[in-house]
Amino acid sequence: MKIAIIDATGHAGSLILKEALDRHLDVTAIVRNPKKLTVAVPFIEKDLYDLTTEDLVPFDVVIDAFNAPAGKEDMHQTSLAHLSEILTNTSTRLLVVGGASSLFIDPEKTTRMIDQVPEDAPFYPTAFHMSQALVHLKDTKGLRWTYISPAAFFNPTGERTGKYQLDDDFLHKNAQGESVVNMADYAIALIDEVLADKHENEHVSVVSQ
């Protein structure tokens, strides 16, 4: 199995890359600046928006760990739209490092987390554009995708415990009543899904135990 990780030098991407390498998987980093890589790994030096179908079809799985910069949060939508377009009608799977804003908080599935976030909140632009990106992803035909949301608190510095809960598209809490997951444990869950391929064309979530 050949795996590509887009933005493999970011917070989530670097931990996903480490998890894949620790499992001795065949992984390639797709980065704009390979000098930021801290491990020896094959890489493609290219901007996400310049990627083509020909670049990605050699891979069985493409992991989208792209994180839009501040002030350009709409790139969460445009970047995923670009990847969806070039992977449509191919056999390559697209796994997306998503956000918690798209998770439902009521049994009727009428309210998502984003629907309760004040528009003047500092994180609203990111939350909004990530949730909208998923809306459009769900409408894409001929694409093998999985969107994996972290818990409400996506902890970049928490230790790797090796434990997590994989759930549906609702906001879930751990045994302590907290919606939190460490990025290192999220990386485990994502690579587990890469290998298992159990949730194609589904929105799932990860929370700590």
Annotate each language-model stretch with its function.
Residues 75-159:
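Glycine-/Pro-rich loop/turn segments that contact NAD(P) or position catalytic residues
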Residues 9, 33, 100:
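Residues in the short beta-alpha loop(s) of Rossmann-like NAD(P)-binding domains
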